[in-house]
């Protein structure tokens, strides 16, 4: 299905936590897995007392031996206490570096799988070639930044890399454009910078603002807390809205691609292409509305993450 990659440009704006919350809030009827592919190493195994294997390391080794096969993925999945399916990353940068060369094959395998994948790519690292390949394979890339001037400066450089411009660009702009949706900005936490101004400076459309909510974030990381307060928290509400928006954009992009394929198969010309675009827009609007109105029925985020 589709890969949605979350990444950051500086610091720790909560990419792992947000990835898990978005995965837990994914619209009903669509299977989703969260995959940790942070070059600095994974956190989920330590947070939830899981083993490092099965996970990304064992999947990478299996693909190295057997080649790409989407059916291999499910053998390396673990579940958080509440049931959210995850591919845990290896602990630490040194361990993560040992599978970096396999991440391109991992990305292709995830893209062929029947589920959607929310991938925690961590902080952007130019030397991490596997991370770059994952971002190339993603249909949506979400850059998560805190609202401050320093983050905006780093975000501008990251945007140039994501869009394939600038001296250090490693992700071709042609890929981002052909992905159907592209790159977006999410501003997370509290700070002095205005989110819309940051988006303008960075050059990415603002997808969402996620409020600072340390208490809810702690619960999402496995610490004890009130289930009722967590479910009603601003952080969970923002994650649900973000999941619905992303899912709607994916549905719209898929509809456009399918309509375009039908037009080409029927020998359609410019008119056929126009019909395809119309179908994509209609589907996107309908799906977005449906997802938004149905978020109340989404299984408890806390239930999926921490039981």
PLM ranges: what are they?
Residues 3-4, 32, 84, 117, ...:
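Hydrophobic beta-strand segments of well-ordered beta-sheets in folded domains
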Residues 25, 40, 102-103, 150-154, ...:
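Helical mechanochemical/support elements of P-loop NTPase systems and associated helical scaffolds
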Residues 167-276, 286-307:
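C-terminal lobe/tail of nucleotide-utilizing enzymes
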Residues 105, 112-212, 218:
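Conserved catalytic-core segment of NTP-binding enzymes
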Residues 50-54, 161-162, 201, 224-228:
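Short, hinge-like loop/turn segments at secondary-structure boundaries
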Residues 7, 37-112, 218-221:
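P-loop/Walker-type NTP enzyme "switch/lid" segment
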Residues 2-40, 44-47, 110:
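Walker A/P-loop phosphate-binding motif and the immediately C-terminal alpha-helix
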């Amino acid at each position: 299905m589709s890969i949605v990659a979350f990444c950051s440009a500086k610091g720790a704006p909560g990419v792992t936590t947000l990835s898990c919350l978005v995965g837990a809030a994914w619209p009903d009827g669509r299977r989703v897995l969260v995959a940790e592919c942070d070059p600095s190493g994974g956190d989920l195994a330590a947070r939830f007392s899981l083993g490092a294997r099965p996970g990304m390391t064992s999947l990478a080794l299996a693909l190295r031996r057997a080649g790409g096969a989407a059916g291999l993925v499910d053998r390396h999945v673990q579940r958080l206490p509440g049931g959210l399916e995850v591919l845990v990353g290896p602990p630490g940068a040194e361990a993560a570096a040992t599978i970096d060369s396999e991440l391109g094959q991992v990305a292709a395998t995830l893209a062929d799988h029947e589920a959607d994948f929310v991938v925690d790519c961590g902080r952007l690292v130019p030397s991490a070639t596997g991370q770059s390949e994952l971002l190339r394979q993603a249909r949506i890339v979400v850059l998560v930044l805190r609202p401050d001037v320093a983050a905006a400066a780093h975000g501008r450089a990251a945007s140039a890399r994501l869009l394939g411009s600038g001296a250090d660009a490693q992700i071709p702009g042609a890929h981002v454009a052909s992905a159907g949706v592209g790159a977006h900005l999410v501003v997370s936490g509290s700070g002095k910078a205005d989110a819309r101004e940051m988006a303008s400076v960075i050059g990415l459309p603002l997808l969402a603002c996620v409020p600072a909510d340390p208490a809810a974030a702690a619960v999402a990381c496995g610490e004890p807390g009130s289930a009722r307060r967590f479910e009603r928290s601003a952080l969970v509400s923002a994650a649900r809205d973000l999941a619905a928006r992303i899912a709607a954009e994916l549905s719209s992009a898929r509809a456009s691609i399918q309509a375009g394929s039908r037009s080409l198969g029927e020998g359609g010309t410019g008119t056929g292409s126009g019909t395809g675009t119309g179908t994509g827009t209609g589907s996107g609007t309908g799906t977005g509305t449906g997802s938004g109105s149905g978020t109340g029925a989404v299984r408890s985020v806390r239930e999926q993450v921490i039981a």
